[in-house]
């Protein structure tokens, strides 16, 4: 009887617990190529285009001859809130959204060499979500904590470009192996 009550209580708590819904993985894309993004990043297991090498080089053996070009438009909402605390000047909302729109290009080309080999290249990027805060409050008698006293703005930015020349070999109808050389800038 106690076990049934415990299981019932655990089930109720599990159903009442909030789920996590992540709209972004931060700097890194949840998928590369419009089809992979539309399928929640499933491109690693189900290649659909010549950007397959971004997540699984072997996938290039399954996409055939193709050229894919695109641009991702990324518009995140970024801010932070400091709850009331013992440092009143450090309370409030801080918006680090000077730049609102990020355009990330992507390109992929694949050429089948017979029925079981593919040679291609995928070019893609990571980034966006940069954050730049205005000069923050100076709570200790005018000592600016957020910029090291330099007068510059505090923030972060990450931009990455990957070029991945790829070779893939189809072992049979359902299996392939592949290798990419990831050249990153």
Annotate each predicted stretch with a short phrase.
Residues 1-22:
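Gram-negative bacterial Sec-dependent N-terminal signal peptides
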Residues 18-125:
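N-terminal, post-signal peptide beta-strand-biased segments of exported outer-membrane/organellar beta-barrel
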Residues 126, 168, 172-174, 181-185:
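Short acidic/polar capping segments at secondary-structure boundaries
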Residues 66-68, 118, 166, 176, ...:
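Membrane-spanning beta-strand positions in outer-membrane beta-barrel proteins
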Residues 98-112, 155-176:
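Outer-membrane beta-barrel transmembrane strands
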Residues 77-100, 127-164, 185:
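Extracellular/periplasm-exposed beta-strand and loop segments of Gram-negative cell-envelope proteins
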